[in-house]
């Protein structure tokens, strides 16, 4: 087969469709849970060319990438690169991708709500959690405009009436 026939424009990676025309690190970064730095580390550890397109990789290379994360072989990188260090239940360092990451984060938030920690209370109230200011930013709901009092409206109408009547006298 020639190179043109082997090129895949859409590659299935971690149960997600990824653009095959992108370079390998950038294409890996499109998967939820894998950032650019993690993608570069994976490419380096597996000995892949970072300048190749994802669609040019063989099926074995793609399986190698998937197995690298699922078989916990990512342990070869420093622990600060994991996206889930010292798991609450097991105590081990993990790197989660796609639906696993979403599931664990959702469970963490529900656990914090259940034990009524500060973060859990903030989550349950729909407020900011990480110490940001909330006086002016992060407002939700319908904006309420400023309404004038009836006295202010009457005074404004009176001024308009005086201005219009005063203008007519000058002309006449």
From Swiss-Prot:
SUPFAM superfamilies tied to this protein: S13-like H2TH domain
InterPro entries: Rbsml_uS13_C (IPR027437), Ribosomal_uS13 (IPR001892), Ribosomal_uS13-like_H2TH (IPR010979), Ribosomal_uS13_archaeal (IPR019977), Ribosomal_uS13_CS (IPR018269)
Keyword Methyltransferase tagged: no
Pfam family, one: Ribosomal_S13
Record-level GO cellular component terms: cytosol; small ribosomal subunit
Disordered: annotated span: 131-172
Cross-referenced PROSITE patterns: RIBOSOMAL_S13_1, RIBOSOMAL_S13_2
Keyword tags: Ribonucleoprotein, Ribosomal protein, RNA-binding, rRNA-binding
Entry superkingdom: Archaea
GO-annotated biological processes: translation
GO molecular function: rRNA binding; structural constituent of ribosome
Biased composition range(s): Low complexity: 134-163
HAMAP family (alphabetical): Ribosomal_uS13
PANTHER family given in the database record: 30S RIBOSOMAL PROTEIN S13/40S RIBOSOMAL PROTEIN S18, SMALL RIBOSOMAL SUBUNIT PROTEIN US13
NCBIfam families: PRK04053.1, uS13_arch
Protein family membership: Belongs to the universal ribosomal protein uS13 family.
Oligomer and partners: Part of the 30S ribosomal subunit. Forms a loose heterodimer with protein S19. Forms two bridges to the 50S subunit in the 70S ribosome.
Function: Located at the top of the head of the 30S subunit, it contacts several helices of the 16S rRNA. In the 70S ribosome it contacts the 23S rRNA (bridge B1a) and protein L5 of the 50S subunit (bridge B1b), connecting the 2 subunits; these bridges are implicated in subunit movement.
The protein's name: Small ribosomal subunit protein uS13
The species this protein was found in: Sulfurisphaera tokodaii (strain DSM 16993 / JCM 10545 / NBRC 100140 / 7) (Sulfolobus tokodaii)
Gene encoding the protein: rps13
């Amino acid at each position: 087969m020639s190179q043109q026939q082997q090129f895949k424009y859409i590659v299935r990676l971690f149960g997600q469709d990824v653009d095959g025309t992108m370079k390998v690190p950038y294409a890996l970064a499109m998967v939820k849970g894998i950032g650019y730095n993690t993608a570069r580390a994976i490419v380096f550890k597996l000995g892949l060319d970072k300048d190749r397109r994802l669609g040019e990789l063989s099926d074995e290379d793609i399986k190698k990438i998937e197995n690298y994360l699922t078989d916990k072989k990512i342990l070869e990188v420093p622990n600060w690169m994991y996206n889930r260090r010292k798991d609450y239940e097991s105590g081990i360092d993990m790197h989660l991708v796609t639906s696993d990451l979403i599931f664990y984060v959702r469970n963490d938030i529900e656990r914090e709500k259940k034990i009524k920690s500060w973060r859990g209370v903030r989550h349950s109230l729909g407020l900011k959690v990480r110490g940001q200011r909330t006086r002016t930013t992060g407002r939700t709901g319908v904006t309420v405009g400023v309404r004038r009092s009836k006295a202010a409206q009457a005074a404004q109408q009176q001024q308009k009436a005086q201005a219009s009547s005063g203008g007519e006298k000058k002309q006449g």
